[in-house]
């Protein structure tokens, strides 16, 4: 059986960042990482990165009712080409995952995906900052992440309840923290580069003040 040698790539793993060869056995598993390795087939990957698959924590994928957005198929195809093996599907209008039925529908659509899709439910109904979604009902379907990506959660009582329920159901919250008054006109991080390009920047304090 043949062994594939990925020669001269940039290896990123828990050991660090280094140039090395990677030998893949006939079962498709990594057999060895090092210098000067031999294999029955060799692929020159100089200038390329070899690593575990990336995970996109903020992906927007449209459904059948949202034809203008990227579809499950096209979105995951782009992800795979970029080295991503999983994407977290964030809930946004008009595809809002704020009940068990919408979760199941998205999971069915995910069968068309070319990589793993991790469904993130909406922490609030209709992505409205004022009303908490049924976190228990949604988490019972297997969802372990919930996002608050819409309007800022200025209703602190709702925010408190969401955080308490997240502990009860052992779920992870994904917050988009940005003060709209400080970031409304910004298009990139505020700094020397934004000044040089003449592009309005978003100051770090816009996120810090929300946290």
Segments (PLM) and residue ranges:
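Histidine-rich, glycine-flanked metal-binding segment
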Residues: 1-52
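Active-site mouth loops of central-metabolism enzymes
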Residues: 57-70, 91, 118-131, 150, ...
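Histidine/acidic residue-rich metal-binding segments in metalloenzymes
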Residues: 104, 131-211
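Short coil/turn connectors at secondary-structure junctions
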Residues: 1-2, 37-40, 46, 50, ...
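Short, glycine/acidic-enriched loop or turn micro-motifs at the edges of active sites
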Residues: 16, 28, 59-61, 179
């Amino acid at each position: 059986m043949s062994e594939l040698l990925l020669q001269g790539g940039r290896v990123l793993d828990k050991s660090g960042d280094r140039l090395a060869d990677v030998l893949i056995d006939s079962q498709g598993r990594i057999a060895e990482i090092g210098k000067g390795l031999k294999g029955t087939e060799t692929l020159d990957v100089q200038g390329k990165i070899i690593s575990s698959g990336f995970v996109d924590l903020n992906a927007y994928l449209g459904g059948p009712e949202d034809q203008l957005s990227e579809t499950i198929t096209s979105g995951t195809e782009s992800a795979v080409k970029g080295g991503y093996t999983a994407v977290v599907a964030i809930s946004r209008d008009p595809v809002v995952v704020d009940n068990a039925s919408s979760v199941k529908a998205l999971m069915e659509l995910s069968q068309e995906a070319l990589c793993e899709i991790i469904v993130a439910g909406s922490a609030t109904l209709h992505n409205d900052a004022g009303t908490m979604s049924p976190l228990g009902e949604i988490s019972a379907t297997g969802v372990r992440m919930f996002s608050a990506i819409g309007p800022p959660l200025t209703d602190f009582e709702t925010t408190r309840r969401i955080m308490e329920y997240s502990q009860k159901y052992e779920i992870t919250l994904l917050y988009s923290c940005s003060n709209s008054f400080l970031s409304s006109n910004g298009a990139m991080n505020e700094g020397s580069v934004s000044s040089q390009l003449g592009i309005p920047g978003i100051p770090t304090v816009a996120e810090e003040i929300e946290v």
